[in-house]
């Protein structure tokens, strides 16, 4: 359980939501826009491992990253869970964007059906509508009004 006094107000409902979830599920935090700064802050507040899938797995492969199968997301999450903490799988949508809606839906359904060693937390912006019905109870949707405003430097940093 995380101490609530030292976290930003927008994270309070996220922490409460996470604490109410099963300890071995796939779940999603839906952001209204791409906010890597907030994903990083969230992972820290949740005391979860932050894995930037695009940066750590796709970028080193260059154009060959398009040959990855969706199971690369699953394998990466499982490998990171060995450390005994929940995993925030940031930029999973970069990988999922390579597949048609049916492929994304299939991966989300597979993730929802798995018994994970820890929670798999998926920050989403684009593909929340592809989540399966069995995951709906494991989703929190944040609105722009819930979040701190994004400064120009944060916007520029998000482009990197």
Question: Which residues are covered by each model-predicted region?
Answer:
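Conserved catalytic network of the ASCE P-loop NTPase/AAA+ motor domain
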Residues: 20-21, 78-84, 111-117
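Glycine-rich P-loop/Walker A and Walker A-like loops and their local beta1-loop-alpha1 context
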Residues: 1-50
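Short glycine-rich substrate-engagement loop in P-loop NTPases that contacts/grips substrate
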Residues: 55-79
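Structural motif
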Residues: 86-90, 121
């Amino acid at each position: 359980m995380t101490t609530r006094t030292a976290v930003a107000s927008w994270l309070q409902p996220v922490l409460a939501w996470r604490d109410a979830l099963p300890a071995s599920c796939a779940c999603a935090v839906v952001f209204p826009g791409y906010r890597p700064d907030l994903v990083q802050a969230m992972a820290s507040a949740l005391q979860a491992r932050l894995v930037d899938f695009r940066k750590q797995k796709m970028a080193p492969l260059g154009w060959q990253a398009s040959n990855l199968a969706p199971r690369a997301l699953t394998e990466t999450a499982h490998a990171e869970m060995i450390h005994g903490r929940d995993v925030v799988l940031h930029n999973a949508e970069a990988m999922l964007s390579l597949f048609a809606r049916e492929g994304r839906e299939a991966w989300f359904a597979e993730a929802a059906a798995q018994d994970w060693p820890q929670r798999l937390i998926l920050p989403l912006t684009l593909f929340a509508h592809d989540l399966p019905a069995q995951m709906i109870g494991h989703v929190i949707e944040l609105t722009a009004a819930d979040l701190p405003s994004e400064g120009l430097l944060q916007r520029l940093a998000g482009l990197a």
